[in-house]
């Protein structure tokens, strides 16, 4: 069921996606999500962590997209032009999000301590090409992260952020220029 809703989202979102078979065969972001769902099941339900990690690395080899099987991903994540996308172990992604090429949802720390060290994206978040969201930060609902932006702090709902470091350029549909 999740696979069908993802394919439907791709068809609605990407003007180049003209029919379902094209999406199934030619979209590495869709392949990566199919693999993630299996690997996540192995990791979280069956506790076959080595096997899940091994399969996730095989998926990375074929798709260019690295999704840790320990990540929590909601419905209809569309990874478009996904080469170089990295999604870390404690990342949480809500429903209806879009990631473009080169996006990193990365962690801070070494992983020695079992704490949340990767970002949380709530629902309907678009992270543009090359953007980096680093650490245990929360990106609120209905957000746009501009290309090449570096986000190190929480981002409130209904806004657009750009820059290094990120700052707000649109909030609730109104142009602004505010620090995070």
Protein language model features and the residues they cover:
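Terminal amphipathic alpha-helical/low-complexity segments used for targeting or macromolecular assembly
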Residues: 1-59, 63, 174-180
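Residues at secondary-structure transition points
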Residues: 29, 46, 68, 88, ...
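Extended, non-globular alpha-helical segments
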Residues: 51, 55, 98-100, 109-112
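Left-handed beta-helix
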Residues: 63, 68-69, 74-75, 80-89, ...
């Amino acid at each position: 069921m999740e696979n069908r809703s993802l394919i439907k989202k791709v068809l609605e979102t990407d003007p180049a996606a003209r029919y379902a078979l094209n999406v199934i065969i030619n979209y590495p972001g869709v392949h990566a999500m199919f693999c993630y769902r299996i690997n996540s099941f192995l990791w979280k339900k069956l506790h076959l962590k080595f096997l899940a990690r091994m399969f996730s690395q095989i998926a990375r080899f074929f798709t260019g997209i690295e999704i840790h099987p320990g990540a929590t991903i909601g419905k209809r994540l569309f990874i478009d032009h996904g080469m170089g996308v990295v999604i870390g172990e404690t990342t949480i992604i809500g429903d209806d999000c879009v990631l473009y090429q080169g996006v990193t949802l990365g962690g801070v720390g070494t992983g020695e301590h079992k704490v949340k060290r990767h970002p949380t994206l709530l629902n309907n978040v678009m992270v543009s090409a090359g953007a980096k969201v680093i650490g245990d930060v929360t990106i609120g609902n209905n957000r746009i992260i501009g290309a090449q932006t570096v986000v190190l702090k929480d981002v409130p709902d209904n806004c657009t952020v750009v820059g290094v470091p990120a700052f707000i350029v649109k909030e609730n549909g109104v142009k602004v220029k505010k620090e995070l």
